[in-house]
Regions:
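Conserved RecA-like ASCE P-loop NTPase motor core of nucleic-acid helicases/translocases
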Residues: 1, 161-169, 190-191
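Conserved helix/coil segment N-terminal to the catalytic DExD/H
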Residues: 9-41, 55-60, 222
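Structural recognition of the conserved hydrophobic beta-strand(s) that form the central parallel beta-sheet
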Residues: 19-22, 68-75, 216-219
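Conserved helicase ATPase core of P-loop NTP-dependent helicases/translocases
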Residues: 3-15, 31-33, 174-175, 185-221
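SF2 helicase motor core recognition
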Residues: 29-31, 106, 216-235
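Conserved SF2 helicase motif VI
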Residues: 243-250
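Conserved interdomain linker/interface between the two RecA-like ATPase lobes of SF2 helicase motors
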Residues: 93-164
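Post-DEXD/H (motif II) to motif III coupling segment of the RecA-like Helicase ATP-binding lobe
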Residues: 44, 51-113
Length: 250
């Protein structure tokens, strides 16, 4: 549409009625100034994943622009670091809905949650900022044949056609993709800076999953937010997290 534009690493539209902007690009000093974007340039500003609004990158945008209306959207307003996003909006919450309510109203797909005990002992592992130590998790997971068998058993039991597995590291994602491929389940690993034997670029992996070329994507922090793959019928949490934000988003 002629009324819609983008402001990101590739496009720099400014003369559109609606602009979809990348936070990483728009938040740079060369764009947040009176010459490029005056503070009152936008009448209406919508910020998705608003729980990030207290971080430096988002805060530069929030503090700079002076729109007539600012709307923040998030499914996970509570942060592990204790920072309060409600302060940014003067505690003005026009609408909120719980996960259960959203499912009951047909806004989200209902799901069955199954917890499977795999005998991994996490009690001695280090935790920093809601994340377990990556190397210690690698040692617990990679090469663990009993865990491989258990994951594969329940994957087969619930007869998934298209699945995503959340892994703790690049090595873990590669290892799981390799293990599933060896068992006859076409799989790919998706992570930043993909360079492994089973690695695929994010959009290409999604395309292959939708087309049935692969059946499982093993990912590391690439599908945590803003993802809608309607054909998915299984999500596998293959690593722990102390962060309720990460858990709910995934």
């Amino acid at each position: 549409s002629e009324d819609y534009g983008f402001f990101d690493g590739k496009e720099k539209d400014r003369d559109k009625s609606v602009i979809f902007a990348s936070v990483a690009t728009l938040g740079r000093p060369e764009y947040l100034n009176e010459t490029y974007f005056p503070a009152d340039y936008f009448d209406y500003v919508i910020i998705d994943e608003f729980h990030h609004a207290v971080t430096d990158q988002y805060r530069r945008i929030v503090d700079y622009f002076q729109p007539q209306f600012l709307l923040g959207l998030t499914a996970t307003p509570e942060r592990m670091d204790g920072k309060n996003i409600y302060e940014i909006c003067d505690y003005n919450v026009p609408y909120q809905i719980s996960l259960k309510e959203a499912i009951n109203k047909g806004m989200l797909v209902p799901f069955h949650y199954y917890g499977v005990y795999d005998e991994t002992d996490y009690s001695g592992l280090r935790i920093a900022k809601g994340r377990y130590d990556e190397q210690e998790l690698n040692q617990a997971y990679i090469g663990n044949e009993r865990r491989y068998d258990l994951i594969y058993k329940y994957y087969r039991k619930y007869r998934s056609a298209r699945a995503i597995g959340f892994c703790c590291s690049r090595q873990h994602a590669e290892d799981m993709a390799k293990e599933f491929c060896q068992r006859g389940i076409a799989s790919a690993a998706v992570y930043s800076g993909e360079n492994g034997a089973y690695a695929e670029e994010r959009n290409e992996a999604i395309r292959k999953l939708k087309n049935g070329e692969i059946r499982v994507i093993f990912s590391v922090d690439m599908f945590n937010e803003g993802v809608d793959i309607a054909s998915l019928d299984m999500v596998m949490f293959l690593r722990p997290t102390e962060s309720p934000v990460v858990f709910l988003q995934q």
